[in-house]
Amino acid sequence: MSLATLDTTEHPNLPTVSTTLFKAKAARKLSFEKIGEHIGRNEVAAAAIFYGQAKPSREDIEKLADLLHIPQQPLEEQLNGFPDRGRSVEMPPKEPLIYRLYEIVQNYGYAYKAVLNEKFGDGIMSAISFSTKVEKETDEDGNNWAVITLRGKWLPFSRF
């Protein structure tokens, strides 16, 4: 099994704790799926903590420290603040997989918007009251397919 690692030269805007977390993850040979299971969160949520894009609870930090064999106190100090979301990726992204996700929004963004507006009315899908998951499907020909589910609360625009 291949594991996601971190090249800090590719990610200069990540918090310093990201390096600590990724080094420990590699040393323990853990996937984000296993880390998520251990802390009781989705694998994408676990990865978002490592990239500084999600705020872990105190319990998450305790469980991460235990699993990754990292002293809890410095980990708490480094993860205690609020995430600076959205700064970790330059736009447009250069990394091919992230660029493909960006390209999906470029190509289908207005189509998604039109269909969502027709189904829900004038509003937006929350990225705060939100969950996501990644699944792998294999078709009858043996081809692998990535299935990404985005689930966000619908927030209607207020009339004023």
From Swiss-Prot:
GO terms for molecular function: cyanate hydratase activity; DNA binding. Its EC number is 4.2.1.104. The active site is at residues 100, 103, 126. The keyword Lyase applies. It comes from the Eukaryota. It catalyses: cyanate + hydrogencarbonate + 3 H(+) = NH4(+) + 2 CO2. Keywords: Lyase. SUPFAM superfamilies: Cyanase C-terminal domain (SSF55234), lambda repressor-like DNA-binding domains (SSF47413). The keyword Metal-binding does not apply. CDD domains: Cyanase_C, HTH_XRE. GO terms for biological process: cyanate metabolic process. Catalyzes the reaction of cyanate with bicarbonate to produce ammonia and carbon dioxide. PANTHER family: CYANATE HYDRATASE. Belongs to the cyanase family. This is Cyanate hydratase. It comes from Penicillium rubens (strain ATCC 28089 / DSM 1075 / NRRL 1951 / Wisconsin 54-1255) (Penicillium chrysogenum). The lineage of its organism: Eukaryota, Fungi, Dikarya, Ascomycota, Pezizomycotina. The gene is cyn1.
